[in-house]
Amino acid sequence: EVKLLESGGGLVQPGGSLKLSCAASGFDFSRYWMSWVRQAPGKGLEWIGEINPDSSTINYTPSLKDKFIISRDNAKNTLYLQMSKVRSEDTALYYCARLGYYGYFDVWGAGTTVTVSSE
């Protein structure tokens, strides 16, 4: 069974950092481009960025490229999202997704929730 499982979400204070993980199984992770996508409460999906199979190319949405770092470990079949300098606007459900051969996301995880709050 092809699966993606995100983890690492939780409550983080404004200005803080958090590292999300996405464990892949059931397919050859090292052959696929992978992406992170998020959905803030009451809003649509927002693409964060993508990484190619050997990590030589990493693309970000311009507004997030100075805050977020995408990486991967093919030996561990795991994708990462390092978040820094988080703000309340970063509160969202964060998904990892596999980019299929036909140019669309063909496998999604269930997501992990990140809440940015000082309370």
Swiss-Prot record:
Keywords for this protein: Adaptive immunity, Immunity, Immunoglobulin
Pfam family, one: V-set
UniProt keyword Hydrolase present: no
Transmembrane domains' residue ranges: none
Keyword Transit peptide on entry: no
GO BP: adaptive immune response
Residues in Ig-like domain copies: 1-112
GO cellular component, one term: immunoglobulin complex
Miscellaneous comment as given in the Swiss-Prot or TrEMBL entry: This chain was isolated from an IgA myeloma protein that binds galactan.
Name of the protein in its database record: Ig heavy chain V region T601
